[in-house]
């Protein structure tokens, strides 16, 4: 499923549930800090971005609780550097609202296309040219609280990683992987996204605490708008994410 669809969900695991419980306690404390809210609240208060906001270590352990379980065993076969501190992504009712810096077209894309993107292809400079600055190994999502599927889950375009891989393998032909970060890939990236929207199915990736999901590093993904009638706790929809970088950068464009 992972190779063909570009993502995989893992069923309830007591070890993951214990980690999520510890992370939720810390997450509530983090979002209550005024300095963190000032730094990370975006989209008119509907999205707490929370990059590296949780105090987890290089193995993902947090608050004395190890990050373990089937999903971690499965990921151990992959090539990646130690984990960064976990991102804490919190979505609140009303998402999305315009983010500071959003153009009208940018906000429409956020609202109508879930701000779909491939992680690591950052917008660089005043002209926001796309470059591969963060060659991730994978995306690991760990829900921290129970929410309905209408509460802004991640969305993935199934099979999109195959299209992205083909496009970028061609784009990087003859270029040493050490130089990929300096290549302007804006045009090929935009063309690849258009192909994905035409050819791939958009699916909601919903999971509960104790469950987990892994998304391929090349998969086009985003965050769905908050729907009317969504069920979520007062603290909003909370998910922790890990995106460790590849140790071998040249593997990035491979499936």
Predicted regions and their residues:
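Non-heme Fe(II) oxygenase catalytic core, chiefly the N-lobe of the double-stranded beta-helix
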Residues: 2-5, 18-202
């Amino acid at each position: 499923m992972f190779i063909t669809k570009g993502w995989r969900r893992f069923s309830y695991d007591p070890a993951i549930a214990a980690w999520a419980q510890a992370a939720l306690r810390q997450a509530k404390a983090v979002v209550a800090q005024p300095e963190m809210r000032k730094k990370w609240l975006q989209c008119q208060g509907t999205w707490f971005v929370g990059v590296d906001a949780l105090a987890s270590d290089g193995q993902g352990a947090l608050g004395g609780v190890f990050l373990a379980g089937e999903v971690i065993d499965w990921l151990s076969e992959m090539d990646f550097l130690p984990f960064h501190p976990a991102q804490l992504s919190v979505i609140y009712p009303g998402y999305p609202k315009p983010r500071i810096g959003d153009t009208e077209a940018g906000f429409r894309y956020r609202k109508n296309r879930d701000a779909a993107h491939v992680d690591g292809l950052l917008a660089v400079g005043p002209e926001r040219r796309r470059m591969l600055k963060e060659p991730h190994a994978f995306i690991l999502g760990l829900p921290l609280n129970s929410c309905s599927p209408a509460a802004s889950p991640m969305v993935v375009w199934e099979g999109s990683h195959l299209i992205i891989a083909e496009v970028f393998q061609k784009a990087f032909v003859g270029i040493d992987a050490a130089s990929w970060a300096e290549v302007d890939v804006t045009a090929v990236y935009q063309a690849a996204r258009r192909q994905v929207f035409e050819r791939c199915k958009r699916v909601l990736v919903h999971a509960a605490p104790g469950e987990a999901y892994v998304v391929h590093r090349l998969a086009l993904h985003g965050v769905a708008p908050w729907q009317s009638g969504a069920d979520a706790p007062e603290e909003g929809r909370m998910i922790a994410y890990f995106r460790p970088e590849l140790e071998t950068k040249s593997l990035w464009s491979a499936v």
